[in-house]
């Protein structure tokens, strides 16, 4: 499995057993000026969403590009 990972936004091979890619977004102190913090990576199971987070999981290679990345 290959997923985009932060902080370098490069597609990387996931560790064994981590077969899902995820995108997690949340607001930090600077949310109004810079927008939401975005974290990308690999997980074994989709994380539980906390009230202030948005989490999307997907199961195909590189299915979690950063929202501002150009589409291939």
Swiss-Prot record:
CDD domains: TFP_snake_toxin
TM helices/strands, residue ranges: none
GO molecular function: acetylcholine receptor inhibitor activity; ion channel regulator activity; toxin activity
Gene3D superfamilies, per the entry: CD59
Pfam families on file: Toxin_cobra-type
Tissue specificity note: Expressed by the venom gland.
SS bonds (residue pairs): 3-21, 14-42, 27-31, 46-57, 58-63
Top-level lineage group: Eukaryota
A GO CC term attached to the entry: extracellular region
Family that this chain belongs to: Belongs to the three-finger toxin family. Long-chain subfamily. Type II alpha-neurotoxin sub-subfamily.
Protein name: Long neurotoxin Tx-NM2
Organism: Naja melanoleuca (Forest cobra)
């Amino acid at each position: 499995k290959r997923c985009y990972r932060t902080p370098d936004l490069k597609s990387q091979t996931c560790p064994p057993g981590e077969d899902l890619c995820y995108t997690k977004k949340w607001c930090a102190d600077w949310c109004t000026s810079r927008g939401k913090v975005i974290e990308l990576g690999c997980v074994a199971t989709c994380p539980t969403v906390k009230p202030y987070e948005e989490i999307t999981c997907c199961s195909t290679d590189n299915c979690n590009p950063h929202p501002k990345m150009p589409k291939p």
